[in-house]
Amino acid sequence: NYDNKAMRAAMIADMKFWVTEADIDGFRCDVAGMVPDDFWIEALAELKKIKPDIFLMAEAEGPQFHTDGFHMTYGWSKHHIMNEIAKGKALADRMDSIIVNHNTVYPAGSYFMNFTSNHDENSWNGTEFERMGDGAKTFGVMAATIPGMFLLYTGQEVALDRRLKFFDKDSVVWLDNRNFTQFYTTLIQLKADNPALWNGSYGGDYKRIDTQHEKIYAYTRTLGDNKVLVILNLSSDAHDAVLNTDSGKYKNVFTGKKQKLKAGKKITVPAWGYVVLKQ
């Protein structure tokens, strides 16, 4: 009952306890959208007085949570579009529209959590392999390279392919799945090493690249001299694409090889293929 001032004060006191006594880094606030905004405004301001660099995440989506004082919100709309694209029910235009909209309506510097799986999705809606099939890695590349902070959920680094029980102990079997372990290691290192992919106001600009094919989604992230070009085939068939971007010399992140890119030259991207190039 958020009309009860004593209850509000007690909740804020409990949150402050964990900051002052345990020196925690921050909070993930569950189901934040079912709590009044004015409570968050008061509570988060109090926490920031104690620890100015505290990190605050809302399990919710919407610009109002950033206005309330949260640093990061869930990228649910992007996640749902990934699932729809995987089923052939949506095109990359939808993802591009969401990103452009976020850049317009959210406060500058907002963080968005991008993901292909999390504890709710895995248990209730299925693993990324159930929902995204052979596109699981492709959408993993997307989640790690579009604007936002990338979530790696329990077991994804070893290709966990079953739903974990939500309310009972259900341990992950840590298989030696080096294919996926190396895949996510490469993505995490890519994000760490390239300022263009950093989060919030620290990261670079996003720009969609015309490919002359609705199933091939390409974009750049650029900050100063640092540029990352991502090319994704969001379908189960190979397709040709013509990139409307500048010619240049790049390094292929996944092969480690140098690669020249010529503007207007046709390239073939295999089914659910992904190419990540950096300068």
Annotated model-derived regions:
Residues Y219-G224, Q279:
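Active-site beta-strand termini and strand-to-loop segments that position acidic
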Residues D14, T20, D30-F112, M142, ...:
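Active-site-proximal helices and loops of the catalytic beta/alpha 8
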Residues G26-R28, F55-A58, M113-F115, F150-T154, ...:
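Structural recognition of the beta-strand scaffold that forms the well-ordered cores
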Residues S110-R178:
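Aromatic/acidic polysaccharide-binding cleft in carbohydrate-active enzymes
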Residues I231-S235:
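Asparagine-centered strand-capping/turn motif at beta-strand->loop junctions
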Residues N244-K257:
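Solvent-exposed beta-hairpin/edge-strand motifs
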Residues N1-A22, A32:
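Active-site-adjacent "subsite" loops/lids of carbohydrate-active enzymes
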Residues L261-Q279:
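C-terminal beta-strand-rich structural cap/linker in extracellular carbohydrate-active enzymes
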